[in-house]
């Protein structure tokens, strides 16, 4: 009898204008990225509230990645600058909560970078797999 290895659950918040289009391009070019990556399309990376990341961890995510437009290329002018400042604070808060900083990542991927999107997801999935299951999940889960 074989023991099945649990694959990590990864939530990817992707900007509609760049990163989601990059994911679409990766798919159209038949570039593989891990099936355990679940993509959530958002209008802009600045619309990802830090509570969304915490909620993803509460609901069982082993890793969360936020993907947006390159700085200076935001469809909403300065959304990604706001994202960068906001998530610098979130990353330090996650460490305070006992969640390894490697479990969360912020990446810039343009609509023309399908290969970069696939490579980024592959790299992040390997990082999360090496970390193993999120041990803090039981403490973070909502008790109902």
Language-model features: where?
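Iron-sulfur-associated redox domains of electron-transfer enzymes in respiratory
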Residues: 1-144
């Amino acid at each position: 009898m074989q023991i099945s290895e649990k694959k990590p659950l990864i939530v990817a918040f992707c900007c509609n204008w760049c990163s989601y289009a990059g994911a679409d391009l990766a798919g159209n070019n038949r570039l593989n990225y891990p099936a355990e990556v679940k993509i959530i399309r958002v209008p802009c990376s600045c619309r990802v509230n830090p509570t969304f990341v915490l909620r993803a961890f509460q609901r069982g995510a082993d890793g969360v990645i936020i993907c947006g437009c390159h700085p200076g290329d935001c469809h909403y002018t300065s959304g990604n600058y706001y994202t960068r400042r906001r998530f610098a604070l979130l990353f330090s808060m996650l460490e305070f909560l006992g969640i390894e900083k490697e479990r969360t990542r912020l990446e810039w991927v343009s609509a023309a970078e399908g290969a970069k999107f696939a490579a980024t997801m592959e790299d992040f999935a390997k990082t999360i797999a090496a970390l193993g299951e999120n041990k803090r999940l039981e403490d973070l889960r909502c008790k109902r």
